[in-house]
């Protein structure tokens, strides 16, 4: 319902694979991290492992951030193939949309996806991988954020990071506006409850893609500068904000923004 990079009918897997190999070959050895995203990277099948092995050979000190829905790893043999690439310097970012399978499957528009993602998460843990669990904040997911936090603590306490992520308003999100759009200022109570509970339980929790001005002040310390440089921007009035240097800014690709955007003025006590 909210995919920011909707699928198209072109079969460009092989062309993009070759292009990516060339990009890796031209990357500086000092590159701190490299992201593998899509679409869905596991659609490459075993070529995904060839790509990862190529990165590890050419850029041995570079961290790999693999963004995937995790479903392919429900097959333990596929997870073990990734393990053969080595578990070091790989972080898998995997979304979970609800503690209820029906809500998760509705958002993905794929029946059974919740069960596959959960099994994939457990298989990746068995294989020794670090996982960043991602919860994209929309009208559906925000209804059960405290319950989601409890579910994560009880069922997925092994994840390395938990990231609550502001939604990029582009792609299918525009088409499904009435189903998924909610202004961030309208879910702050639920978000604060979920984040603070996970933090209290000792999980490493962050808030991505949300400006400080739309967050409750108690959440500022969890906010991360998370938006990629190529699609990051700030409004003109952000120059007046005392927290601009700490703030993630906005998606340049988003067609809609929160009505709560405003510069934050800090008054120092004399």
Set out the residue ranges of the language-model regions.
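Canonical Radical SAM [4Fe-4S] cluster-binding loop centered on the CxxxCxxC motif
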Residues: 1-17
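Flexible mid-to-C-terminal extensions adjoining Fe-S/redox cofactors in radical SAM and related proteins
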Residues: 216-270
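Radical SAM enzyme [4Fe-4S]-AdoMet core and its adjacent flexible, acidic
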Residues: 11-14, 106, 110-222, 233
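Radical SAM/AdoMet-radical enzyme domain recognition
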Residues: 21-35, 45-165
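A short, conserved beta-strand element in the Rossmann-like catalytic core
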Residues: 42
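Short, histidine-centered active-site or binding-site loop motifs used for metal coordination
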Residues: 4-7, 98-100, 168
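Residue-level signal for well-ordered alpha-helical positions
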Residues: 3-6, 107, 244, 253-254
């Amino acid at each position: 319902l909210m995919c920011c990079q909707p699928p198209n009918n072109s079969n460009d897997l092989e062309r993009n694979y070759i292009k990516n190999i060339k990009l890796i070959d031209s990357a500086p050895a000092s590159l701190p991290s490299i992201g593998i995203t899509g679409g869905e990277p596991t659609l490459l099948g075993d070529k995904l492992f060839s790509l990862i092995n190529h990165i590890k050979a050419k850029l041995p000190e570079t961290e790999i951030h693999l963004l995937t829905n995790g479903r392919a790893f429900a097959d333990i043999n596929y997870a073990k193939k990734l393990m053969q690439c080595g578990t070091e310097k790989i972080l898998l970012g995997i979304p979970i949309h609800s503690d209820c399978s029906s809500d998760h499957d509705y958002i993905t528009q794929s029946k059974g996806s919740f069960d596959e993602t959960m099994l994939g998460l457990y298989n990746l843990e068995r294989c020794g991988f670090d996982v960043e669990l991602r919860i994209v904040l929309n009208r559906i997911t925000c209804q059960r954020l405290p319950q989601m936090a409890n579910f994560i603590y009880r069922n997925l306490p092994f994840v390395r990071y938990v990231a609550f992520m502001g939604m990029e308003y582009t792609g299918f999100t525009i088409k499904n506006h009435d189903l998924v759009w909610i202004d961030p200022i309208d879910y702050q109570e639920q978000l604060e409850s979920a984040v603070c509970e996970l933090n209290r339980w000792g999980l490493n929790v962050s808030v991505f893609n949300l400006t400080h001005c739309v967050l409750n002040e108690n959440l500022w310390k969890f906010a991360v500068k998370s938006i990629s440089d190529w699609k990051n921007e700030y409004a003109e009035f952000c120059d007046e904000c005392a927290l601009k240097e700490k703030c993630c800014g906005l998606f340049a690709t988003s067609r809609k923004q929160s009505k709560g955007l405003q510069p934050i003025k800090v008054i120092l006590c004399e």
